[in-house]
Amino acid sequence: MKITISGTGYVGLSNGLLIAQHHDVVALDIVPSRVELLNDRISPIVDKEIQQFLKEDNIRFRATLDKFDAYQNADYVIIATPTDYDPKTNYFNTSSVESVMQDVISINPAAVMIIKSTVPVGFTAAMRQKFATENIIFSPEFLREGKALYDNLYPSRIVIGEQSERAREFAALLQEGAIKQEIPTLFTDSTEAEAIKLFANTYLAMRVAYFNELDSYAETLGLNTRQIIEGVCLDPRIGNHYNNPSFGYGGYCLPKDTKQLLANYQSVPNNIISAIVEANRTRKDFIADAILARKPKVVGIYRLIMKSGSDNFRASSIQGIMKRIKAKGVEVIIYEPVMEEDTFFNSRLERDLHCFKQQADVIISNRMAAELLDVAEKVYTRDLFGSD
């Protein structure tokens, strides 16, 4: 079977390499340097399992810039292109997904398109009508950046937004590549599958916001946050997981998915979802005020990335803190080794960690790192448990 992947980010590569253990996979991208890296079996992103799989001889995987080469004779085309949230329209920008669909229908109308990109509720049904085809299925992705392939090898669940034989066939491709056995698999209608993805991420954002608000309360009243969280999480209905305070939820998925869900249901009475978005803003204000209370002349930002093991700093929570501090006229310097630029939002990047530590009066780090232990007295973090 020939499977094509459109988009070579975390979602595309993790799905492609999972399936390439047993089938021929072609990855399509528009960036020549990225395609060249992949054909040299070098990962363009930081992900241990992706890096390992690319080195394996039995992985039937190649990359191309040629959409005709990619789409011709493909049985399935997995669409994993970016759908950034557009604050002007309160909507995901789905233009890249729609462009892929147009190309696939022109080149290989028999191919079944599987949307892995996150899309608004109702998008798949609208695209079937727009392009006059039933060959579009939505299947949400549940993965962590930096552990994308791992999360496909050991998936928590598989959701396919169609109840059909071809949906079961695609689910079998994912199950075949996974190491985990007995994977919970759910077949739903397309719109319900889209809602599952957005509501799942919104719940995670709510949990982050909840423990952050608990931490803000404890900090304000001089209480021990760790003791409170440990006591609260002994209740098995709450559970001792995903409870480490932070600078707010961030990254590529949670901020845009909560806002999209809010926009999707603006005509439906709701309180919780809007409160989650507002709570995240309030948390960033609280953190910035706590840092400014130390009256630093220079604040050092240790890493822009959202979490350890990732090379992605899109919409990371620490950026919101940085912007609030800069707005008060405080100088900000940044240590971020994965960035090639010399500045970020008009703040200087310091590439030497020792010099960075010397120059900063306060170093802010969303998660504590071993290489900051020698200047622990300078570090401001709300990391209590050493986990994401």
Swiss-Prot record:
Annotated binding of substrate, by residue: 141-145, 197, 201, 242-246, 250, 307
Catalytic activity, EC: 1.1.1.22
Pathway the protein contributes to: Nucleotide-sugar biosynthesis; UDP-alpha-D-glucuronate biosynthesis; UDP-alpha-D-glucuronate from UDP-alpha-D-glucose: step 1/1; Bacterial outer membrane biogenesis; lipopolysaccharide biosynthesis
Active site (catalytic residues): 253
The organism's place on the tree of life at top rank: Bacteria
Positions with a binding annotation for NAD(+): 2-19, 29, 83, 118, 145, 252, 256, 314
InterPro entries (alphabetical): 6-PGluconate_DH-like_C_sf (IPR008927), 6PGD_dom2 (IPR013328), NAD(P)-bd_dom_sf (IPR036291), UDP-Glc/GDP-Man (IPR017476), UDP-Glc/GDP-Man_DH_C (IPR014027), UDP-Glc/GDP-Man_DH_C_sf (IPR036220), UDP-Glc/GDP-Man_DH_dimer (IPR014026), UDP-Glc/GDP-Man_DH_N (IPR001732)
Keywords associated with the record: NAD, Oxidoreductase
One GO BP: lipopolysaccharide biosynthetic process
Matching Gene3D superfamilies: N-(1-d-carboxylethyl)-l-norvaline Dehydrogenase, domain 2, NAD(P)-binding Rossmann-like Domain
Catalysis performed (reactions): UDP-alpha-D-glucose + 2 NAD(+) + H2O = UDP-alpha-D-glucuronate + 2 NADH + 3 H(+)
Disulfide bonds: none
Alphabetized Pfam families for the sequence: UDPG_MGDP_dh, UDPG_MGDP_dh_C, UDPG_MGDP_dh_N
GO terms assigned for molecular function: NAD binding; UDP-glucose 6-dehydrogenase activity
Membership in a protein family: Belongs to the UDP-glucose/GDP-mannose dehydrogenase family.
Record's protein name: UDP-glucose 6-dehydrogenase
Lineage, opening ranks: Bacteria, Pseudomonadati, Pseudomonadota, Gammaproteobacteria, Enterobacterales
